[in-house]
A protein has these predicted regions:
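Intrinsic low-complexity, intrinsically disordered or marginally ordered coil/linker segments
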Residues: 1-158
Length: 158
């Protein structure tokens, strides 16, 4: 689970982010996976899963993300975009770093209960936290993801 607030001094750049997110391929828009002259993802005979390795090394996560059919489209409100989305096993920290390099301002949180980690990314810094008990989870993440209800639901299922 990821929550992201994006802003930029240039309204056109912020609209570019909205359009990329709503197209469903925001990482690919800003950090495209290398392709050959035919537009196909480059295949490496030494690494049959080159796309996977490239994505994790550059985006920070296995798959791209963007608007899903069950999400509302991203919009600009008060000079920023606020979205929530899912990624596979890790947050897109490499992608956030690239946006920061392009003068976007990023404020993000992430929570991965299956792997017992969470974190806060702000001003180009990632505060990654592995937790063994719920007391280690920062209050901001606890509140943002409604973790009281989440953990009560998990306990009911056990």
């Amino acid at each position: 689970m990821n929550s992201l607030t994006v802003s930029h001094d240039d309204p056109a750049k912020l609209q570019e982010f909205v359009d990329a997110y709503n197209s469903g391929n925001v990482c690919e828009h800003y950090l495209p996976c290398p392709k050959d002259e035919n537009g196909e993802i480059i295949k490496d005979e030494n690494s049959p899963n080159y796309w996977y390795v490239w994505n994790v090394n550059n985006w920070g996560t296995k798959w791209d993300f963007g608007k899903e059919e069950y999400h509302d489209p991203a919009t600009i409100e008060d000079g920023k975009v606020v979205i929530s989305f899912n990624t596979a096993w890790s947050p897109p920290i490499g992608f956030y770093n690239e946006l920061e390099n392009q003068d976007y301002k990023i404020n993000a949180t992430y929570f991965e209960p299956g792997m017992s980690f969470c974190g806060i990314y702000k001003n180009g810094k990632d505060n990654y936290i592995e937790y063994e008990d719920h007391d280690s989870i920062p209050r901001r993440i606890w509140d943002e993801y409604g973790l009281t209800d989440f953990f009560e639901m998990i306990e009911e299922d056990i």
